[in-house]
Amino acid sequence: MSEGESKDSSGSECPVCYEKFRDLEGASRTLSCGHVFCHDCLVKYLLSTRVDGQVQRTLVCPICRYVTFLSKKSSRWPSMLDKSSQTLAVPVGLPSVPPLDSLGHTNPLAASSPAWRPPPGQARPPGSPGQSAQLPLDLLPSLPRESQIFVISRHGMPLGEQDSVLPRRSLAELSEASLAPRSARAFCCRSRALLLITLIAVVAVVAAILPWVLLVRKQA
């Protein structure tokens, strides 16, 4: 197989579940780093990185650790979405703890239920790797039948080495954590400066009034 054929073969399938994109029409999603994944794998990844049940507004590429920013849209049925657009339909109410693999380790790209099903007439081929994990949404009556819609933007940034040990914290939380000490130091400096200015003003007023008071007493 030539080098061009090898690149074309690797780019036509999801690097996580190895399903061919041509078998899942409209299911491919491209991150800002250029890596392409199927819709299901990205949604499972988002579900596994939730914090306090909230889906993060950033998505870290499992391959290159590049951060892609997401924007939230109004909730709609996944069947009403344009499958060719850069959207992710994340179901509401699914458990946030990912299942264990055969070795007892957590797999962030595995989930017990699907996030999206192909439209009628575009079913997965028999024996496909991701078919065993597909559960119809009809079998989950206790879960809300709605989804959070996120749009994959073209903007992103590399993930720093100091942030790689905190995959479950969003960039917003990291920025807030870094800004908190700065805000505290700035407030402390402003308080000290205000106290010093007040003290100087009081001393100046006393120094200006005291001679007049002494002069009035001496004349009296």
Curated annotation (Swiss-Prot):
Coiled coil: none
A GO molecular function held by the record: zinc ion binding
Signal peptide segment: none
ZnF start-end (RING-type): 14-65
SMART domains the record matches: RING (SM00184)
Annotated Pro residues bias: 116-128
SUPFAM superfamilies hit by this protein: RING/U-box
Predominant place of localization: membrane
Highest taxon above the source species: Eukaryota
CC terms in the record's Gene Ontology section: membrane
Transmembrane regions: 196-216
Keywords of the record: Membrane, Metal-binding, Transmembrane, Transmembrane helix, Zinc, Zinc-finger
Membrane-topology descriptor: Single-pass membrane protein
Span list, region Disordered: 108-136
Alphabetized Pfam families for the sequence: zf-RING_UBOX (PF13445)
Compartment(s) of residence: Membrane
Family annotation (PANTHER family): RING FINGER PROTEIN 222 (PTHR47095:SF1)
Protein's recorded name: RING finger protein 222
